[in-house]
A protein has these predicted regions:
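Active-site acidic catalytic loop and adjacent metal/ATP-binding pocket
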Residues: 60-65, 73, 117, 211-263
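Short, surface-exposed alpha-helical segments at coil->helix boundaries
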Residues: 29-33, 85, 89, 278
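ATP-binding pocket architecture of kinase catalytic cores
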Residues: 51-177
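Juxta-kinase regulatory segment immediately upstream of eukaryotic protein kinase catalytic domains
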Residues: 2-44
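Helix-rich C-terminal or lid/interface subdomains of diverse kinases
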Residues: 141, 145, 224-227, 267-362
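Glycine-rich, phosphate-binding/catalytic loops in enzymes
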Residues: 90, 137-138, 171, 249, ...
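An alpha-helical support segment within catalytic cores of ATP-dependent transferases
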Residues: 27-46, 139-145, 156-233, 289, ...
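Generic structural signal for small/hydrophobic residues in well-ordered secondary structure
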Residues: 61, 73, 92, 105, ...
Length: 362
């Protein structure tokens, strides 16, 4: 069983980097047979109608009926034998206890008796918000308020230390324990490696790389956090289910960490429009303080997040996609457009930090 001690972000730092970021879910008939057998052994005749789902994330996903209820099944079959599904289940139980809408974990098993970990969740009959963004029907007023408030409220969960949680602890006790003693060590983890990857792939220039490291170095005092908060770490419209005007569930917590209170807010900026991010930040600010150095830390989080996302997008070939069918690519656009937006997001963070790092740069 692997811990995430050397992982800043799983999808790009894992040993089998970019596993599950391609089209590997398209033909999984053989794996479906194994999943069906494994779950039938666990649930017997209570489980029926197991079929492949159509997820675009890094888990193979399925749908089924359990005790007459439609359910959603996520599996993790990577070579690292990562069991972070146990952490996710422990975290979402705590988030749900705050009254925040998240999927309830009905059952999970990280024993890997059949070579994979699995998790059973209720099937939620809602589209992700990205679908409404793409077809132009989303109503941001109420949704932005719910997102900002949701982030502020799940930050009530605070654990000593920083970074990813210890999988062994979650599996043994259901408890939460982090893997890094301070925030700066987590923030800088694999940073140079990520920047070098982007330079070697000709996404960034050597000059860009020097500028990035210089800007971060000039602001390193803001990485000295006394205590962190729960961070979703993959917060985006495709990880929120709902209607055109209402959030129904914050999903996919399998990258959650303890980090900076500004992290999840910055992620909404990295993956969305500035006008929407301003609304989300304002909603957050009605619940939690945004004074002091919050603006600078927001842009530091933004920069670190767009860098790891650029690594994933380049490494997984997203910049080469020719249509908007992939969830990351906006309607009517392609991979080249995604590359251009990614560069713009990097430049935005660098420019904001070089000019003082306030929220007015949004």
């Amino acid at each position: 069983m692997a811990e995430r001690t050397n992982i800043y972000y799983w999808k790009c730092d894992r040993e089998d980097a970019f596993h599950g970021t391609s089209d590997y879910q398209k033909d999984q008939s053989a794996f479906l047979t194994v999943v069906r057998k494994t779950l039938e052994e666990r649930f017997g005749g209570a489980l029926t109608d197991v079929v492949s789902s159509c997820g675009q994330g890094n888990h193979r996903t399925f749908e089924a009926v359990l005790d007459g209820q439609k359910v959603f099944i996520r599996t993790e079959d990577g070579m690292e034998k990562d069991n972070y599904l146990a952490v996710e289940s422990a975290v979402t139980n705590r988030v749900a206890a705050l009254g925040i809408p998240v999927p309830e974990t009905m059952a999970f098993d990280c024993s890997r008796k059949q070579g994979f970990a699995w998790q059973v969740l209720p099937f939620l009959p809602y589209r992700d918000l990205n679908a409404y963004v793409k077809d132009g029907t989303i109503v941001w007023t109420g949704i932005a308020e719910q997102i900002g408030t949701g982030v502020a409220r799940w930050q009530e969960i605070s654990v000593d230390g920083f970074g990813p949680f210890c999988t062994a602890e979650a599996m043994a006790t259901g408890g939460l324990r982090t893997l890094h003693p301070n925030y700066e060590s987590y923030y800088r983890l694999n940073l140079a490696k990520h920047v070098r990857f982007l330079v070697d792939g000709e996404f960034l220039s050597e000059r860009d790389a020097c500028r990035i490291m210089k800007v971060i170095g000039a602001h390193e005092r803001f990485l000295n956090l006394a205590r962190g908060v729960l961070v979703h770490k993959d917060l985006a419209v495709w990880n929120i289910l709902g209607t055109e005007s209402e959030v129904k569930s914050f999903i996919d917590w399998d990258d959650c960490i303890v980090g900076d209170p500004m992290d999840d807010l910055s992620l909404m900026g990295v993956t969305g429009e500035d006008s929407v991010t301003r609304k989300i930040v304002a909603a957050y600010g009605r619940v939690r303080d945004l004074e002091g150095d919050a603006g600078t830390r927001f842009w530091l989080c933004w920069l670190r997040n767009i860098l790891f996302k650029a690594v994933i997008r380049q490494g997984a070939g997203y910049f080469k996609k020719s249509s908007d069918e992939f969830f990351l690519i906006g309607g009517g656009r392609n991979g080249a457009d995604l590359a251009a937006v990614t560069r713009q997001k990097i430049e935005k963070a660098l420019g904001a930090l070089e000019k003082g790092g306030g929220f007015d740069a949004l």
